[in-house]
Amino acid sequence: MIIIKCGIYHLRNDDIQGDVISRYRSYNVRPLAFIFDAYVFSWFWDNMYALLVTIIVLHVLNLYLIYKICEKMGIYLSAFCLCIFALCPILVESIYWISASTRIVFSLFLCLSSIYLLLKSFDEKNDSKKLMFFYSAILLNLMCVGFYEQVIALNLFLFIFLMICLKKYKYIWIPITSTVWIGIWYVYFMMHGEMQARGALNISGMLETTVNCVKMIFTNYINAYSNFIYSLGFGKEAVLSSLVTVFVAILFVAFMIYIYKKEANLGEKSNTTRKIIFAMIWIIVPFLPFIVLDTKFIAVRNLYFCTFGIAVISEMILDLVLSLVKNDNAKNIIKTSILAFICFFFIISNIDGVNNYRKVNSIDEKVTKQIIENVPAEAFSNGKSISINYDANDLFKYKNLSIFVESTIESDWATVGKIQVMRKSTSAPTIYVNSNQDKADYVLYFDGQMNLVKN
């Protein structure tokens, strides 16, 4: 559904801007993220659909790697938590917003691949392959910390926990080395660079920041829940009025059959203590950077990691409740039915996103096209500025009501990315939205129908 939703319509591509495409600046606090933006992900610029499919494949591979790693730890994950993590609507921003997914999903893939290859090296008998797996694991681990602060923390704790479980203590130096090198990089940004706030420590205000982080996490989940419930009505209408009903029905039956067989074979195999600790690492650790570093905002995309941990804990609670059911066959049917219905409603919520994209993207396209057609070409060169002005009420009318999909034209940096995508150009003008009319080189006004009225 994410492919259908995002492949048809233009994606938000805000951070891939002219200065990132054309050159790498040493002041970027996430070193590999900006290198990959400029020299890897920019290759997909003319085919964002291909990039999105790639990200979704990585998301699925992350699920597979988590599953295989957990097997080595004596933790057996059922399809219940894996499917919830795969389809939960709250993860959509982490995936469809390419500037986030290239950091979150991709860096997690590097982290998990590093752990998986190290485990492969333990079992490999051939010496040359053993060394290849081992050194590849080290390289990927050094790379994964260069993309996102949450992955830095998760990589350290997850790796160490795994080595403790397997009693491979001598390999703990691998994540420590990765953390030290990126830590030195961040210390540099406490004193230099345009992004120095991301590298500044917040020791004195940690308690207050912790409380604020908890509030923001709960707020994001509560908002997500309310938007999820709101979107069910629109999603239901889409299902009942289109052929997608057939797709959802087939998927529903497939889940019922597949999950039933999967649950029947797993039984109660997991080391419960390890499973709880493993889940808590995913829930708590990714938020530590927000407490330690001087960052003030937790977005919906930052819930990507902890949602998996919550899915694991939720499954454990459900299993505890279902332990009251004595008949194993009935227990599996109940659990399978619950999962199938959850996935069914998740899909309906995502279907609502398709309609939201139609509405929001059509307005984004309309406004951006008018900007491009009515402003001289030199206005889009670096160093120039454009002030774009809408009536606040009119803009709100076209703004998506769901947190899962955002409008491009409501923010300056996203509008820049939209213009670049439509012009197929790396030039990056400065954009002001409803501000700096006297300062900008060009000033545009739009009416209630989002038509240009004054240039």
Residue ranges of model-derived segments:
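Polytopic membrane enzymes that build or remodel cell-surface glycoconjugates and lipids
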Residues: 1-455
